[in-house]
Amino acid sequence: MNAAEAAERLLGRQVAATRRLGGGDLSAVFRLTLRGGEALIAKQAANAVAEAAMLRAIGATGAPAPEVLAAEGEWLLMEAIETDGAVGDAWPDLAHMLGRLHAATAPDYGWPTEHDFGPVRIENRPAPDWPLFWAERRLLCHLPFLSPDLGRRIARLADRLADHLPARPAAALLHGDLWGGNVLVAGKRVAALIDPACYHGDREVDVAMLTLFDRPPRFFLESLGLDSGWPERQPIYRLWPLLVHLRLFGDSYANFVETALRAVGF
């Protein structure tokens, strides 16, 4: 089933035009124009139904997310969001929206369902202890795919996480893959947060991802009101996306992993 066929079956509307959009390393994304002229986005991904639930969870906090029109099998249909800028135009509003997102908390860390970045499985089984969750679900899960030396260093860090991470930070709702490309901007405001990989955890995780690929200004970071010592925890939280990228895209990320490990003494 192609994108147009999926939309026609799920929405009962005829599709007049289909255009594949750029990006989408791990999934295919299309802009569809219906017979009446309305536009929508169709995303083809194995975790389409899970992503729909995440978008709805984000929207329920008051942070902007595309409206889910339908989700079934490998197809997610969403409203089309018009944009006219980039994340650098909307730092003040992004800080405000992250405040809304992260204010939604849960009793435990994790998420009701597993997720994935392409072939990399994201384990989300709930855990009552944050260092335990980060060790088992975000670091040790990579060991079978790493070199023996790198695996040993990751394992040593995992054993010492209680010395580096808070035991019970607020289990905030996280976007989970927060970088500038997943922040849609219009009129210098955040129009939508897209492509989530949600779970509940320390809100500093979203900051670590955002500062990995983007350069937020100082006022943005200060406005978040992060806990004392947050810069020292950032390398530990960056290891998760870096290890995922190492597995997905190869050794070009090895030096970044090394830098993060050395920053925390491993």
Question: For each predicted feature, which ranges?
Answer:
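A cross-family kinase active-site recognition segment
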Residues: D84-P148, A170-A171, A197-H200
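ATP/Mg2+ or Mg2+-diphosphate-binding catalytic cores
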Residues: H245-F266
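Anionic-ligand binding region
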Residues: A158-A162, D177, V183
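Active-site Asp-x-Gly
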Residues: P126-L132, A171-L173, G180, L184-P235, ...
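A conserved alpha-helical element in kinase catalytic cores
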Residues: E38-A103
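Active-site beta-strand-loop-beta-strand hairpin of nuclease catalytic cores
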Residues: T33-L40, V185-A191
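Conserved short strand/loop->alpha-helix "switch" segment adjacent to the catalytic nucleotide/phosphoryl-transfer site
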Residues: D163-A172
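ATP-binding glycine-rich phosphate-binding loop
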Residues: L10-L34
